[in-house]
Amino acid sequence: MAKAEHTSTAKPSKPAAPERVAAFRTGLSAEARAAALLIAKGYRILAKRFRTPHGEIDIIARKRDLVTFVEVKARASLDDAAYAVTPRQQQRIIDAAQAWLMTHPEHAEFELRFDAILVAPRSLPRHLIAAFDAST
């Protein structure tokens, strides 16, 4: 009696491309540096990497009656990082912030702000306060 062969139609998963893994690790490191900067400035981190179908917010932090939604950008230079937050990305962050506020109504009356923290090798992170606003 012949033994039946089992063939799988599922493709084996490929490991992530080294460039993507490196970019992911760079992003995590930049977010950790940004969170440390915010904590040193007196902020309390409320959430990291908050994801919605509409977008993602890297860090949500609070200081007194202010909630700030922070986009972290890591690039080869701080100038390159400064230009990396596009209007489309800003809108996605604003949409994600609205989703977060719907699930955290206790913060709805707080002052809200959209900041960016720029990270580059051999440089201190740069905190751009009110990098953009919800009217853009």
From Swiss-Prot:
InterPro entries tied to this protein: Restrct_endonuc-II-like, tRNA_endonuc-like_dom_sf, UPF0102_YraN-like
GO molecular function, one term: nucleic acid binding
Domain of life (superkingdom): Bacteria
Family, per entry: Belongs to the UPF0102 family.
PANTHER family: UPF0102 PROTEIN YRAN (PTHR34039:SF1)
HAMAP family: UPF0102
Protein name: UPF0102 protein BBta_0181
Biological classification of the source: Bacteria, Pseudomonadati, Pseudomonadota, Alphaproteobacteria, Hyphomicrobiales
